[in-house]
Regions:
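Hydrophobic beta-strand residues in large extracellular and virion-surface proteins
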Residues: 13-15, 49, 59-61
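A short beta-strand micro-motif
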Residues: 11-21
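Short, surface-exposed beta-strand/loop "edge" segments at domain boundaries and coil↔beta transitions
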Residues: 21-28, 67-70
């Protein structure tokens, strides 16, 4: 398999992992956010989102510039989606 990064043409993605459902408003409270990473490729973004889901975290993906929610929130108790970003 050839692993070629998928360029996002200058777009950066923020992967946020939290310990509770961010849709309830609790995901952004202190100590509920497990991690936050910024990636420049869709490939890296997808890999890290799946990494956090496998570890039981809720996951959301945002556009770093516009702060627009692009994907999620994904429930770690559900099957991972086939497409994230």
């Amino acid at each position: 398999m050839i692993d070629t990064p998928c360029p996002a043409f200058g777009r950066r993605f923020v992967v946020e992992a939290s310990n509770s459902d961010p849709a309830t408003g609790h995901g952004h409270e202190r100590d509920n956010q497990a991690d936050c990473e910024i990636h420049a490729t869709r490939t890296a973004t997808n890999q890290r989102a799946r990494f956090f889901l496998r570890r039981g975290h809720w996951v959301e993906v945002y556009d770093d510039d516009t702060k627009e929610l692009l994907a999620g929130p994904f429930d770690p108790d559900q099957a991972a989606p086939a497409y994230i970003v």
